[in-house]
Design a protein with these regions (language model features):
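N-terminal secretory signal peptides that target proteins for export/translocation
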Residues: 1-14
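Short hydrophobic alpha-helices and adjacent helix-cap/hinge residues
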Residues: 31, 35-330
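Small/flexible residues
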Residues: 10-12, 18, 42
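Bacterial N-terminal signal peptides
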Residues: 17-28
């Protein structure tokens, strides 16, 4: 083949290659279809898809039916609980064109706060958002952020316990990586100091060191508080089995813990969290400025006493304490 023919073939190949590349690139970078572009998107972020968050989410979805219909989609992300994974999920929500970002729990909410997304963020199931600097104490809103508080003050639970049990030594099991656990720890340490109670702060992180830390509890400790943490949820059964075997009463704000063997629990309703969150989302969808929507407080708060555990631990619960209990586990 002559050189001219070779050059002609080579040039034809290059032209076809460039044309194919341009076609592929035009397809790759073209915008979404009109149907997708017109779709309204709510992006939900929850760490590790925990059972409690799934309950909140189910209530949320059910109550969005009035404003999130056929032209609306709810997209759920369940990243790992580390900061980078959560912040990447926030960025992805923005890139997908979410109109609202919904976060469950403190870790996802703090990740959204750090990212400062240009779209409104609403949260649920967060312990003391003011104390965690998610919303301001004055306006009860954050920067393009609002939601519903996910707790009742831990001081109330501690008072119920100290009114029932003579407490001289008290242990706090906390996760150093949980912002809400650190806040609860500080509050209980201050309350204990005023009452003259000695506190043993037991830090846990990885699943394997729960047993080691629990083994350090004094024989005469009068009670243990399990601080709120997205890590503790998976270890709750183990911790309660250990403490009950050692005849140590446990109090906590982890929802559902009384049914698993905790002595006293002060918890909020997952149903209400989801319902109120949907209420806020509907207001934002209708055009209201999220900065004009202060954080809501929970009204459905349950104080649960496990009398079966009390009997096993030889604890006599005063009638005054039982009279304020929302539910009793027998």
């Amino acid at each position: 083949m002559c050189l001219a023919s070779i050059d002609r073939v080579r040039g034809d190949f290059v032209w076809r290659f460039l044309l194919s590349t341009l076609i592929i690139m035009s397809c790759s970078f073209s915008g979404p279809s009109q149907a997708v572009a017109d779709e309204r998107l709510i992006a939900v972020i929850m760490a590790n898809s925990q059972p409690r968050y799934n309950q909140v989410h189910a209530a949320f979805v059910k109550n969005t039916e009035g404003f999130c219909d056929t032209d609306c989609r709810i997209y759920v992300q369940t990243p790992n609980a580390d900061t980078m994974s959560l912040r990447n999920s926030v960025r992805k929500a923005v890139a997908l064109g979410a109109e609202i970002i919904v976060t469950y729990g403190p870790l996802a909410t703090l990740a959204a706060k750090a990212e400062l997304p240009p779209v409104p963020t609403i949260f649920a199931d967060v312990y003391d958002p003011v104390g965690l600097n998610i919303v301001s104490a004055s306006t009860k809103t954050g920067r393009n952020m609002s939601g519903i508080r996910g707790d009742a003050p831990v001081q109330g639970l501690f008072k119920y316990f100290t009114d029932t049990v003579t407490v001289r030594k008290f242990a706090i099991l906390f996760d150093m990586h949980s912002p809400e656990a650190l806040l609860q720890k500080r509050i209980l340490e201050e309350s204990s100091k005023r009452k003259g109670i000695t506190v043993y702060a037991m830090e846990v992180g990885e699943a394997h060191n729960y047993f080691a830390q629990l083994g350090k509890l004094p024989d005469d400790v009068d009670g243990v508080f399990i601080a709120s943490s997205e890590q503790h949820e998976s270890q709750l059964s183990f911790v309660l089995g250990y403490t009950n075997a050692r005849k140590i009463p446990v109090i906590t704000q982890l929802a559902g813990a009384a049914d698993e063997g905790a002595f006293m629990v002060l918890e909020t309703s997952a149903q209400e969290q989801g319902e109120k969150l949907a209420e806020i989302a509907g207001q934002v969808f209708s055009g209201q400025n999220i900065n004009q929507l202060p954080m809501l407080k929970p009204h459905s708060i349950a104080f649960v006493v496990n009398l079966s555990v009390a009997k096993e631990l030889s604890i006599k619960v005063p009638i005054q304490t039982l009279s304020v209990a929302s539910r009793v586990v027998r």
